[in-house]
């Protein structure tokens, strides 16, 4: 499993909105500038997040985007699944109802299923708020005079 640029940028965009939620609607150009991501690229990600009701859009002057819910309501897993489709480490675990033709005889299937569970459990238990809190704690710990 390799997380694409789209997935990483979607996560960074959501984190930026979480960090600036007190600012109300945030312009895409501001997110792009702070995150050093092309505005055009973010424009491709917005519809994915918007369609799934992760973002609220406001058009016109003072327009922009904001999170629909609190940062603690969004997990890394949910954001990455929107942009990546699935997070399975091997193709035989993809959303295929038939599965692999060797499924019943595969000696490594339990290994891949276990890895898939570890990945899902990890990503589904980290929220945007957790990441922000961790970042702030690390920033305070690294402060020196």
Question: Each predicted region: which residue ranges?
Answer:
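Short amphipathic alpha-helical interface segments
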Residues: 10-22
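A short alpha-helical element within helix-turn-helix/winged-helix DNA-binding domains
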Residues: 29-35
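Alpha-helical residues within the helix-turn-helix
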Residues: 33, 50-51
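Key DNA-contact positions within bacterial/archaeal DNA-binding proteins
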Residues: 40
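Short, hydrophobic-biased segments on the C-terminal half of alpha helices
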Residues: 46-47
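Beta-hairpin "wing" of winged helix-turn-helix
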Residues: 54-67
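C-terminal regulatory/oligomerization modules of transcriptional regulators
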Residues: 76, 94-145
């Amino acid at each position: 499993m390799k997380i694409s640029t789209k997935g990483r940028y979607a996560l960074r965009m959501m984190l930026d909105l979480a960090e600036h939620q007190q600012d109300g609607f945030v312009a895409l150009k501001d997110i792009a500038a702070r995150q050093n991501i092309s505005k055009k690229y973010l424009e491709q990600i917005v519809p994915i997040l918007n369609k799934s009701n992760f973002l609220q859009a406001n058009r016109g002057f003072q327009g922009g985007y904001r999170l629909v819910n609190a940062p603690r309501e969004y997990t890394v897993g949910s954001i990455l699944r929107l942009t990546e489709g699935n997070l399975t480490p091997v193709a035989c675990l993809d959303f295929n109802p038939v599965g692999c033709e060797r499924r019943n005889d595969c000696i490594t299937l339990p290994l891949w299923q276990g890895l898939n569970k570890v990945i899902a459990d990890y990503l589904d238990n980290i929220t945007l708020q957790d990441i922000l809190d961790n970042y702030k704690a690390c920033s305070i710990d690294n402060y020196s005079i």
